[in-house]
């Protein structure tokens, strides 16, 4: 049986590296690590036959069309903030484009990392996130809305951090 392929976006960040390390130690999955700068990955053996580094911008997913069609699970930790245009492009548009390139018959799970600032105490989306939140919070709320209406809705999980 072929090992599962797990895509981790933002794999050079703190959360992405932690997840990749955990998976290397606790699974036999192959990891596709999507990063802009592989030099920022300091805690993962990039020479492992189980690791494939995808170097590129999340806003240009067609570069990895073949790899994305093979993915079984997505752990989406990549994010942007600060520049409103880039924040929207990365946090909303790039996610939609990435989802469109996945092969629905292969995908078992999508884990979306976000912020607790978009949820109420019952884990429902806060309408205020759209109205009063920073562009970062607004784009995270919009992306969650998109995920909830996407074909992958039943396969998606939200992980929010404080």
Regions inferred by a protein language model and the residue ranges of each:
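Conserved glycine-rich Rossmann-like NAD(P)H-binding loop of the short-chain dehydrogenase/reductase
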Residues: 27-39
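Conserved Rossmann-like nucleotide-binding pocket used by diverse enzymes
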Residues: 7, 32, 54
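N-terminal Rossmann NAD(P)H-binding glycine-rich loop of SDR-like oxidoreductase domains
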Residues: 4-29
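Structural motif
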Residues: 5, 72-73, 109
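SDR active-site strand-loop-helix element
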Residues: 9, 34, 77-78, 110-116, ...
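Conserved beta-loop-beta element that borders a ligand/cofactor-binding pocket
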Residues: 146-162
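Conserved Rossmann-fold NAD(P)-dependent oxidoreductase catalytic core, especially the SDR/UDP-sugar
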Residues: 93-139, 157
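NAD(P)H-binding glycine-rich loop region in Rossmannoid oxidoreductase-like domains
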Residues: 47-97, 101, 119-127
